[in-house]
Amino acid sequence: MKNPFDFFDEIYCINLDNRIDRWKHAQKEFDKVGIKDRVIRFSAIKEDDGRLGIIKSNLGIVKLAKKKKLKNVLVFEDDVEFIVDNPLEVLSKSIDDIGNLNWSLFYLGANTHNKLIKIKKHLILLKNSFAVHSMAYNENIYDVFIQKYDGVKMLYKHSDILDVFLAQEIQEKYICLMVNPMMTSQINSYSDIEKCEVNYDFIKERFKNNIK
């Protein structure tokens, strides 16, 4: 495996057609880790409720992954940024630590809310953690995800929001992992989901506090 990102069968980045600025940013980030030519741009599904658009976009990718019989698929959001000096080394060591673990979700970064559980030196067992800016789905979770969201037209309750569902349901029932140290966060910029400028510095601070 020349590049640790070869661990992932396919890599997608969700990007709204009108956010050319975000796509240019994302390509620069992908170029840093040698995957610019591998990342497939997924035209984000636009909804008045951006949270619903994120769900439908992820659902579209997961359905593609199942159709293509991919063992796993890595999904980025277009505001992702690599926050460590050696992301390829971090990812490589974390993947080595996975070994034969039957994981379902594998995060490169997350908004953590609890003290983090290190199951190996470079691997965290993730619980009660949010955000979906850089996350891989394993094939064992495709059907669970599709069953939850297929045909969704609106969000009826808070627990239907994508990262809330993953944190409260999937992370509680399945093996969900994150690299250690966390290697991605999100840039501070205008969010089409939140409809305002968002500062994501708190994600990095929470990780520092929760990994102690």
Task: Give names to the regions the model predicted.
Residues 1-76, 80-212:
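An acidic/histidine-cluster motif and surrounding catalytic segment
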